[in-house]
Amino acid sequence: MFPGSGRQTYQQQGYPPPQGAPQYNYGPPQGPPQGYYNGPPQGYNGPPQGPPPQNYNYGHYGPPQGQGQGYGQGGPAPQMYNNNRQSGAMNDVSTAPQRFGNTDMTYQLSNCSGRKKALLVGINYFGSSNELRGCVNDIKNMSNFLNRRFGYSYDDMVILTDDQNQRNKIPTKENIIRAMQWLVKDARPNDSLVFHYSGHGGITKDLDGDEDEGYDEVIYPVDFQQAGHIVDDDMHAIMVRPLPPGCKLTALFDSCHSGTALDLPFVYSTKGVVKEPNLWKDAGTDAFGAFMQYERGNIGGAISSIGGLLKKVTNSSSSNRQQVINIKASPADVISISGCKDDQTSADASINNNATGAMSWAFIKTMTDMPEQSYLSLLNNMRTLLKEKYSQKPQLSSSHPQDMNIRFIM
């Protein structure tokens, strides 16, 4: 069990990459109209019979380059936002421990010089009434991007997509959870881990009171009708809580209702300040003070207010100490970039005749066109790319107070 949930969670058992899941075979997509990564899919009664699609081999999809097929073509490029900085003027990452105000709680950033591992999940829901077209492509493009831009080895990637016929590579709930556990197993300081999900997302009633809107965000495995969805609280418990200080986890969610899908406490605006006091509910003046200090750009003052709040609840009753755990802060370096706000849908798009998730495309294109940029410029550039055609607004959240002007690395 994890704090406040009233639900069974998933213990860290040191699982290897997924093995022994039920066998599924997938027929080719039927060409559904352009839609949204909403959820859950209606009328999905299990995968159709037959071999996997023959045109979905990995070699068919080249890596997304600045001039590559499907990227950077078809009209003038939008103006990129660079935070008025040259690449050399960005702040570099400091790996020294940093304190949450005047408490004993600390966090530590990663310089990403250690091991690199990635878990990439893409689900098209072949044969369902809400079939998607771009999710499998997203994963193939992302794996190539991670390999060529950041040096991730294909041997250190677990790829779960529903166009495969190997039972341990199908994105069932069991396989996804076991792969999440594999991702964080034996994590060390300065390691860099990536989790990418493209598929249907949704919301379910919040059972532990940690969501302001009263709902938890969820993702839908390919077998969700039989096995159920995966809740943000569980993803946090599996992938965030076990991480040591100085270990980096970058999570990318290209799905609906994904703004806080990893349940991280700090949500940032395009101005580089905390946009929502998402960290505490009914926490009183300390939380409000922290939020106002961030709005004024006073990071030191904000951290001091945060420290006052944490110290107050830590020194109070055991039930309040439980609230500290539920804050969802972490000593590790965890960042989540999501395709839209919690109340928005995320587009399943066609970019130059290539099916893709709009958010996944925007992330890869932004980083390909401008490899050296800050977290702030990345968030703004993604929004600039998307705003011409899509209403969704990418979100960035973190497990700690984030300097939005440091260099984005993963």
Swiss-Prot record:
One Pfam family cited in the UniProt record for this chain: Peptidase_C14
Biological process terms in GO annotation: apoptotic process; protein quality control for misfolded or incompletely synthesized proteins
Protease found in the keyword field: yes
Chain intervals with Polar residues compositional bias: 80-94
Region (Disordered): 1-94
Gly residues: bias regions: 65-75
Coiled-coil positions: none
TM region positions: none
Active site as annotated: H200, C256
Top enzyme class: hydrolase
GO CC aspect terms: cytosol; nucleus
EC number, UniProt record: 3.4.22.-
The keyword Phosphoprotein is assigned to this record: no
Entry's Gene Ontology molecular function annotations: calcium-dependent cysteine-type endopeptidase activity
The entry's keywords: Apoptosis, Hydrolase, Protease, Thiol protease, Zymogen
InterPro entries reported for this sequence: Caspase-like_dom_sf, Metacaspase, Pept_C14_caspase
Family designation: Belongs to the peptidase C14B family.
The protein's role, per its UniProt record: Involved in cell death (apoptosis).
Name the record gives this protein: Metacaspase-1
